[in-house]
Amino acid sequence: MAKFDAHLKCSFCGKSQDQVRKLIAGPGVYICDECIDLCTEILDEELVDSQGNPRHSSESNRKSATASHKSGKPAPTLATIPKPQQIKSFLDKQVVGQEAAKKVLSVAVYNHYKRLAWQGDGQGETDLSATRLHKSNILLIGPTGCGKTLLAQTLAELLDVPFAVADATTLTEAGYVGEDVENILLRLLQKADMDVEHAQRGIIYVDEIDKIARKSENPSITRDVSGEGVQQALLKMLEGTVANVPPQGGRKHPYQDCIQIDTSQILFICGGAFIGLEDVVQKRLGRNAIGFMPSDGRGRSRANRDLQASQVLHHLEADDLVRYGLIPEFIGRIPVSAVLEPLDSQALESILTEPRDALVKQFSTLLSMDNVQLEFESDAVEAIAQEAHRRKTGARALRGIIEELMLDLMYDLPSKKNVKKFTVTRTMVDEHTGGKVLPLPANDERSHQESA
């Protein structure tokens, strides 16, 4: 063996093992440290010629990737952070209803960015006796289409911070097919134009968080790579850690350059419908009704059973989320929770007309580009809201109904030069939602109606 080792030589320059400092073996080939240095220089020269950005080594790549983007936007200060009442007033302009949830969000977001401003002043870093402030992530619970994502988007718009939406259903535990949890941070980084400092003050909304609930209360039954495994992977990110994010996304591997992001200043808002959670709470509230009880006890239990789902969720406790499938460590990192109410017909009517980006205003703006004034009768708005409420998909149903209703209108009106105004009536809505597509009146009839 010693004789064999003495004859080892570099497959590229021919130098023996004794003539070089290090000889690295591959499958049937060898390369010395001098040839490796030469290859590195050649690659660096090519990068300089093609990009005009010299990069000397993989270690310098990591440093430059982390520090190449300095934030051009100033960090928040106590003077610039909007107060909770100001935050709620801004939310009121965009989101209809959900008063309790907006109040919870306003206070939580204000405290979070006040904490960042306090750390930015250096008080929390230089004074060892100062109280350290920890962040409080937020959990939004509510049915589909009730405004969970819109609330988070509106907050990001007000605070002028990067905002990214992630789908928890695509995440899997490391080593399995699917997305790594670090890809969530990559989306935020892309929204911040790859500005690391700016991204570290952003907001991430993790949607469908209820879909990663553990499939069974027994944690040892089977490997749950898209449920409990994802919760475990998210723990450190929610709490605050320095994560290595691949700039191009995808799976991480040991030899790629990564961007380091500190998640301790990122606000995570998790949202989900949590279908069936009210049954878990109801079971706990009505547990005392089993067996022989006084009449007043049975009455209280019967009243609990009669509570609506939204009312039941106001009695939500952490143990209920554990029974639903979230692990205690995960719940502990999302201490602030808010329950959103399902939208009734009256709220859906308001959504159609009141917010800045209301659907009626959007379609009126679209037709105004064709010099046509579009109006909706109040009865028509009411009928659209009632149909959306019947479909039980919340505010998302509104756009679908109006798109279907306006299809023929949007097709014909741009070609009609002498039509300047069109009114959507309840009759049109009723006939459309009843399964009949109402044909548009002839051009001369509409003109006659308009002149009349």
From Swiss-Prot:
- The entry's ATP-binding residues are P143, T144, G145, C146, G147, K148, T149, L150
GO BP, one annotated term: cell division
Q: Which organism is it from?
A: Prochlorococcus marinus (strain MIT 9313)
Coiled coil spans: none
Keywords, A to Z, come to:
ATP-binding, Chaperone, Metal-binding, Nucleotide-binding, Zinc
Q: SMART domains annotated for this entry? A: AAA, ClpB_D2-small, zf-C4_ClpX
**Which domain of life, per UniProt?**
Bacteria
- Record GO terms (molecular function): ATP binding; ATP hydrolysis activity; ATP-dependent protein folding chaperone; protein dimerization activity; unfolded protein binding; zinc ion binding
Q: What is this protein called?
A: ATP-dependent Clp protease ATP-binding subunit ClpX
- Quaternary structure? Component of the ClpX-ClpP complex. Forms a hexameric ring that, in the presence of ATP, binds to fourteen ClpP subunits assembled into a disk-like structure with a central cavity, resembling the structure of eukaryotic proteasomes.
Residues holding Zn(2+): C10, C13, C32, C35
Which parts of the sequence are annotated with region: Disordered? 50-79, 433-452
